[in-house]
Regions:
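Histidine-rich, glycine-flanked metal-binding segment
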Residues: 1-48
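C-terminal cap of metal-dependent C-N hydrolases
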Residues: 6, 336, 346-375
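Conserved, mostly hydrophobic/aromatic
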Residues: 44, 55, 122, 178, ...
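Di-metal (Zn2+ and/or Mg2+/Mn2+) metal-binding site signature of metallo-dependent hydrolases
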Residues: 45-67, 355
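Divalent metal-dependent hydrolysis catalytic cores, especially in the metallo-beta-lactamase
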Residues: 57, 73-102, 115-128, 155-167, ...
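Active-site gating loops and adjacent loop-to-helix segments of metal-dependent hydrolytic enzymes
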Residues: 77-88, 128-156, 198-210, 221-234, ...
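Active-site core of metal-dependent hydrolases
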Residues: 153-274
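His/Asp/Glu-enriched, well-ordered alpha-helical/loop segment
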Residues: 224-235, 253-265, 271-351, 355-357
Length: 375
């Protein structure tokens, strides 16, 4: 495929007018047209890399923790239709028995239709009982090296991220023991600044949905957010314009830098569906507009009802984030954070030919996956 007359998002994080060439599913620097080859005229549209979502739970009435091929394929199809072409869905806090079924289903899945399943984000159960958010406290478990390794074996190595509250018993030891096997993220935590620093020094590199389910910043108790800033951690942001005020989103890009921010959807099964009653991690959730809350605790946000592409779009159009920065945070950064950036996350030569064409208002005009138009 050749995509002509596009404003291409380059590896230098700028836009340049030009053409994209895709051969055998991957981007090449240049190629002569072949007989019968599909040529897509972008007509001046933006050409963005296919997005990479490393933290979402569900969409279209399905949840990754359903533990079925039907659920995984539904998520893969929906995400691809929204320009998200690599997915690393997140588990919820469940028992090892339930998580076994999730890992088995993921290991059995074969890519080829819809977004590629490139990993698993193990958000629970190694989190704080005081910051469970919408996680089910019944299934909380101390950080357990053996449990992680058993699940990783069942997942055939697909677990890319494990979330840990570092102040909990055994957590720092877990980080030291496992940081060479999987990326460790600080999450759902009451940790102090000092303990967070110790966690990063032990091998953690990542912060799950920054600002949410963690202590804030004060001048005498800087907390985990300042620890993450000082240690150069990668930080996730949910930019659905519900979880975080736009000023805090801009603040994060300016302080951490757009090379350290990762946009995530953190979406639950209602994403793509009308308002109504749904569930997340076995708990009832009420969805109205972009807001999802626990039905029995209306003040507790229960994930989002917004896909990653729309989160990126809102970051630009509603929150004042430069387009170049938002695209980087939704494609290259998440790909790098889980080690798949040789294949996904940019329009560099050698990467998969995953391309979104979008107009000036960031409405999707086309989605190309590995050189084949799917939208």
């Amino acid at each position: 495929m050749i995509i002509k007359h596009a404003k291409i998002y380059t590896p230098r994080h700028t836009f340049e007018e030009g053409d994209l060439f895709i051969r055998e599913g991957r981007i090449v620097p240049f190629a002569q047209p072949e007989a019968g080859e599909e040529v897509l005229d972008a007509k001046g549209a933006y050409a963005l890399p296919g997005l990479v979502d490393i933290h979402f739970h569900g969409a279209m009435g399905k949840d990754f923790c359903d533990g079925t091929e039907e659920a995984i394929q539904t998520l893969a199809d929906f995400e691809a239709s929204k320009g998200v072409l690599a997915i690393c869905p997140a588990t919820m806090t469940f028992s090892e028995e339930i998580l076994n079924g999730v890992m088995d289903a993921a290991a059995a899945h074969r890519n080829g239709k819809g977004a590629d399943l490139v990993g698993i984000n193990m958000e629970g159960p190694f989190i704080s009982p005081k910051k469970v958010g919408a996680q089910n406290p019944e299934y909380l478990h101390p950080a357990d090296v053996g449990m992680f390794r058993r699940l990783q074996k069942r997942a055939n190595g697909l677990i890319k991220l494990v979330d840990v509250a570092p102040e909990e018993p055994g957590a720092l030891e877990f980080i030291r023991e496992c940081c060479g096997e999987v990326r460790i993220s600080i999450a759902h935590t009451c940790t102090s600044y000092n303990t967070a620093c110790a966690a990063f020094d032990a091998g953690a590199t990542h912060m799950t949905h920054l600002y949410n389910a963690m202590p804030g910043i004060t001048h005498r108790a800087p907390g985990p957010i300042i620890a993450a800033l000082e240690r150069g951690a990668e930080v996730e942001l949910i930019t659905d314009n519900v979880h975080i005020h736009p000023a805090m989103v801009r603040f994060t890009f300016r302080t951490f830098g757009d090379d350290h921010v990762i946009l995530i959807a953190d979406s639950m099964m209602a994403c793509g569906l009308p308002d109504g009653q749904y569930s997340l991690g076995g708990q009832a959730v009420t969805v109205k507009g972009p807001r999802a809350t626990l039905t029995e605790q209306p003040g507790t946000i229960a994930g989002s009802a917004t896909c990653l592409y729309d989160c990126m779009k809102r970051a630009v159009l509603e929150m004042g984030v430069p387009l170049e920065s938002a695209v980087r945070a939704a494609s290259e950064n998440p790909a790098r954070s889980i080690g798949i950036d040789n294949d996904y996350g940019s329009l560099s030569a050698g990467r998969y030919g995953n391309v979104i064409l979008a107009d000036e208002a960031l409405n999707i005009q086309a989605v190309v996956q590995k050189g084949t138009r799917i939208v």
